[in-house]
UniProtKB/Swiss-Prot annotation:
The gene is nifB. S-adenosyl-L-methionine binds at residues 93, 144, 196. It comes from Methanocaldococcus jannaschii (strain ATCC 43067 / DSM 2661 / JAL-1 / JCM 10045 / NBRC 100440). Keywords: 4Fe-4S, Iron, Iron-sulfur, Lyase, Metal-binding, Nitrogen fixation, S-adenosyl-L-methionine. Its cofactor is [4Fe-4S] cluster. [4Fe-4S] cluster 2 binds at residues 262, 265. It is an enzyme of class 4 (lyase). Residues 24-266 form the Radical SAM core domain. The lineage of its organism: Archaea, Methanobacteriati, Methanobacteriota, Methanomada group, Methanococci. One of its GO terms (molecular function) is 4 iron, 4 sulfur cluster binding. This is FeMo cofactor biosynthesis protein NifB.
């Protein structure tokens, strides 16, 4: 990325714990789990909602938060954890595939204008919604890019739901890659700050991750390479060793700065890494039944 543009973003990235390692353990963030539905089927992804969702990883949330509860929930969070600077939407599905995401962002923009607005997405719909995100004053967007070669990506993503149709295998992979790259470039031109997350899967994309960095280096502020958590249809695969992770990050760092302090957080994460109970307490205090949905109601 151009150094002048990086400097332009400094006032935001210096206080965003997922873009700046130096303040990762000092500045808090809150994830609002308002987006349950997803439009792609990653073979390593198993979303969990409800009381059984006790794991601390992406795709997991105790509950789906409704937009009408966002204001009171954020008021509680900010009262208890005043070092919160960033509010993000990271699932448990794909943010851009859920209308509740945009309803929530509008509420935040009106009621909490001083919070940095952030979201995570698989990027399939980014080229459709990048301008809407900018208009809602979203500042940072994280896009998960696991391959830019369809032959590799088809081993990671089983299907893609796009344009009212399910696309399997290489067909779906091609659509996803094309939309991701197009969306990232358009978001960059709109002055959105882009981070890419890449899941390192040794037996599938380890020798390919550097190609992602080369391809996107002019449009991405930072890259976050995270180890595979062997789940779902990749439960038989191994995660990378520390040495493998280190080596791939060093190779990619020649092209894009690397983020090395990721906690692979839940969709309802709040505060610093250790602070995880606010959402449950919030619903108990409201004497309200948890708004939990069965995953069968949503596409993967």
């Amino acid at each position: 990325m151009d150094k002048n543009k990086m400097s332009k973003f400094a006032h935001i990235t210096k206080v965003h714990p997922c873009f700046n390692e130096k303040i990762h353990d000092k500045v808090g963030r809150v994830h609002l789990p308002v987006a349950p539905r997803c439009n792609i089927a990653c073979k390593f992804c198993r979303r969990s909602l409800g009381k059984e969702a006790c794991e601390h990883r992406p795709g997991v949330a105790l509950s789906v938060l409704k937009p009408e509860d966002v204001e009171s929930y954020l008021n509680k969070v900010l009262k208890e954890i005043p070092n919160i600077k960033v509010v993000g939407i990271a699932g448990p599905g794909d943010s851009l595939f859920n209308k509740e995401t945009f309803e929530t962002l509008k509420i935040i923009d009106e009621k909490f204008p001083n919070l940095i607005k952030c979201l995570s997405t698989n990027g399939l719909l980014l080229n459709k919604y990048y301008k809407k995100l900018a208009d809602l004053n979203v500042k940072t967007v994280t896009v998960t890019v696991n391959a830019i070669d369809p032959e590799i990506l088809k081993e990671i993503v089983e299907w893609v739901y796009y344009d009212k149709k399910v696309h399997y295998g290489i067909e779906g992979a091609k659509i996803l890659i094309e939309n991701q790259i197009d969306g990232i470039k358009k978001a960059y031109d709109e002055d959105l700050i882009i981070k890419i997350n890449t899941v390192l899967i040794p037996e599938i994309n380890m020798n390919h991750v550097v190609d992602i960095a080369k391809e996107l280096k002019d449009f991405v502020y930072i890259q976050n390479i995270i180890p595979l958590i062997p789940l779902y249809k990749m439960s038989h695969l191994r995660p990378p060793t520390c040495e493998e992770l280190k080596k791939v990050r060093e190779e990619c760092e020649k092209y894009i700065p690397q983020f090395r302090a990721c906690g692979q957080c839940r969709a309802d994460a709040v505060g610093l890494i250790k602070e995880r109970k606010i959402l449950e307490e919030f619903f108990k205090e409201k004497n309200k039944k948890l708004n939990v949905f069965e995953l069968k109601h949503f596409s993967h």
